[in-house]
Amino acid sequence: MAKAKFERTKPHVNIGTIGHVDHGKTSLTAAITIVLAKTGGAQATAYDQIDAAPEEKERGITISTAHVEYETKNRHYAHVDCPGHADYVKNMITGAAQMDGAILVVSAADGPMPQTREHILLAKQVGVPAMVVFLNKVDMVDDPDLLELVEMEVRELLSKYGFPGDEIPIIKGSALQALEGKPEGEKAINELMDAVDSYIPQPVRATDKPFLMPIEDVFSISGRGTVVTGRVESGIIKVGEEIEIVGLKDTQKTTCTGVEMFRKLLDEGQAGDNIGVLLRGTKREEVERGQVLAKPGSIKPHDKFEAEVYVLSKEEGGRHTPFTNDYRPQFYFRTTDVTGTIKLPADKQMVMPGDNATFTVELIKPIAMQEGLKFSIREGGRTVGAGVVTKINN
């Protein structure tokens, strides 16, 4: 059967459901598809289909994730839902499921629970820009004062972790009632989607961000100069523009005198393109894999940062033993490994395989980085962890 062409008529947004186990994330995901299917905006997907999420590999880590897509009047959404708590932790840290926004599901009958807190904190750490709350299972709560109390608790918790708790939309409803086709259940789902449409901001497209290309390879072409190749991560590069070479050494300025793709000359390269960039007056030995080409002033090299990290379990091919303070593995950023030393917080003696942790890293050479940059931790060529830069320290 022929694949349907992806129609890009509406702006696209990536979202996901987060929250404590059994608070109804998967039921809500199913309910959204079933309610939107009535207006032709989705394919109705049953709970069991979503719950049997396939396993995926992201940077050597096994993650179970269910993907559904649907659309509202205004937008097209790709929605991720994970069966287990560990899958969320891995997903958010590796960026396997890049979220432009999240729907936090809280059971009105139970209120915020430990994983509710952990997911809010993780969302903040990894830079999920906005979230909307669905207060689920309201059909199980008879007392309106209790509902109000739970809503207050959720707002306080969001504010505590740096989200605007007072202004985040909280929609009360029952995913189960929506799945059963009850009008009040469906009404809440439609309200939720309106809130997601209006409150979760449209993401900035990669081409609208400053130019950045990680350097994968360097060649010298006799009579023409030095060419660096790589995949453009963001922005646009035009022939004749000034650019900087950032990371590993002192930042150098140069000019792009040519862009090539598939052996053809182009006027510009943009996000997603695999290109070769000809650099004016730059010698082959002045550039290396692991540096980046970037718009001048847009990114700086750093060697000290804080990170949120997931450490692979033994079953995932990770370490068999915990690591302690001053552990010195390799940190793989974009295209290269750099050795670094880990400093654990004072209250943490060690990090076990299968855990996630926050700690500080000091690299032996600076890397072009900004908050939100993903990396792997490697030991003797195998991946033992995955992380995201949450704060730059120098």
Swiss-Prot record:
Give the EC number. 3.6.5.3
Q: Where is this region: G4?
A: 136-139
Q: Where is GTP bound in this sequence?
A: 19-26, 81-85, 136-139
Q: Which Gene3D superfamilies match?
A: P-loop containing nucleotide triphosphate hydrolases, Translation factors
Q: Which UniProt keywords apply?
A: Cytoplasm, Elongation factor, GTP-binding, Hydrolase, Magnesium, Metal-binding, Nucleotide-binding, Protein biosynthesis
What domain of life is recorded for the organism?
A: Bacteria
Query: Which stretches of sequence are listed as region G5?
Result: 174-176
Compartment list: Cytoplasm
List the molecular function annotations (GO) for this entry: GTP binding; GTPase activity; guanosine tetraphosphate binding; translation elongation factor activity
Question: PANTHER family from the xrefs?
Answer: ELONGATION FACTOR TU, MITOCHONDRIAL, ELONGATION FACTOR TU-RELATED
HAMAP family annotated for this entry? Answer: EF_Tu_B (MF_00118_B)
Q: What is the stated purpose of this protein?
A: GTP hydrolase that promotes the GTP-dependent binding of aminoacyl-tRNA to the A-site of ribosomes during protein biosynthesis.
Indicate what this protein is called per its UniProt record: Elongation factor Tu
List the taxonomic lineage.
Bacteria, Pseudomonadati, Pseudomonadota, Alphaproteobacteria, Rickettsiales
